[in-house]
Amino acid sequence: GVTTEVISASNGLYFTIDSDTLDEILWIIDSKRLALGTSAGVYFLYGSETNLTVTPQRFTINKETSYSATNVDPVVVSNVIIYPQRGGREIQELEFSGAEDQWLQTRISMKAYDIISTSNITKLAWQERPNPIIWMIMDDGRVLSLSYDRQVKFKAWSVHSLGGTDAKVTDIAIIPKSDYDQVWFQVSRTINGATKSYVEVLTRFPSENVTTRNELTFLDCAKIHKATEQLVDSSGDPETALVNGASQSGTSLTVDGATATPATGTRFVIMKPDGTASTDTTIYETIAGSSATSWNLDRALASAPADNSVIELRLEELTIAHLEGESVGLCTNGMEHADETVSSTKVTLDHQLSTTAVSGLFYNASMTTLSPPTLDNQYNWNKRLLTLTALIQESLGIRIEYNDLTEELLFRSTQQNTGEPISLFTGFRKQTLSGIGWDVHTVKINSISPLPMQINGLSIELETGGP
């Protein structure tokens, strides 16, 4: 008989790219068409111009750009392919233009040459929410980001320097959540003379309104400490202790609502039954011999608490074992605390007022303005900066540097006591740049505390002094 081969749409396909060079296929990604990144450019595999479905009888392979790829996987943003060029120091954008019926190539890293040209890109990651950002891991351990919003034609580059000694980011992962994309980093550092590797996650912005003020985290390798964690049940869940019975006095307090015995040295205040502050603001401390239902105190009760009064635990000693020997930044109840050095896995706070604390490593957060433009007929004229107006959103702890001078933006009013928590500032803040020279045309803005700094806009007023 005669043997025949039937070719059907379900047959597997094997292609050889027709090219003048020996091209290595480095990645394949699905966009508007199937894209093949090679060592000699990017090819597209599709059925036909009228039907993109690939079958054994209908297929097309076209080379759309000669800009080579690397083995770093690209990202796709709104059907635009973004990939590192061979050498890993340029970023190419490949976009299909319906009006011109062709793929258009753009080198979007041109304005970031000074920060991207010193090392190679090893990984890309795309974060869609809350802000559209392309993250890039460099082989020297730095992290670059490109804020990328095609709808408003917005692109902005940033360099991210992580806190700690010899800090290097070795990997990144994006985990989509219901209302945002979670960004995870793997970071290596030298801690207490040894190299440590930790997995860290970026926390949420204040503007997202999902994180309490006390838990805002603007430190690296950070840890959140809660006073409630000092009293937990057998499953490790926090317990709330209540005063059991009115008219108590002396140095013993009968409690209920908790099954755990407080550790010696546990500090607390007695609130009202509804959880608000009472007239007794004394900070009590448990001593040896306490039980789950009877707490021995270091002093006599100042007044008889009401039945079912809430016992609010307070922090004084924090355990930060993963940063042994390091100087750490601290926030207590949403306000900056003096730096401390971790010794024997612990740091001791300067006060006993906080229910929540955040500890971690400081990182550099700053921005420098460009030299402002001049009129067409004033290119060689002298100019001097007069004022800087910043549009600030939910921020504190901002300092301006220029001409070897520093000026801190003040957000605390004369009616607020030093150390008293103040609200994050939102609005315009105008700063006079007094004493700035005619030859200084840039201003640096720094975050100087473990609190948020978000600058949404800058306006500079200047004067010109003739040629």
Where are these regions (language model features)?
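WD40 beta-propeller blade core
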Residues: Y43-F44, L144
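Beta-sheet repeat architectures centered on beta-propellers
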Residues: D20-D23, S66-A69, V80, G87-G289, ...
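Catalytic or ion-translocation cores adjacent to nucleophile or general acid/base/metal-coordination motifs
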Residues: G47-R89
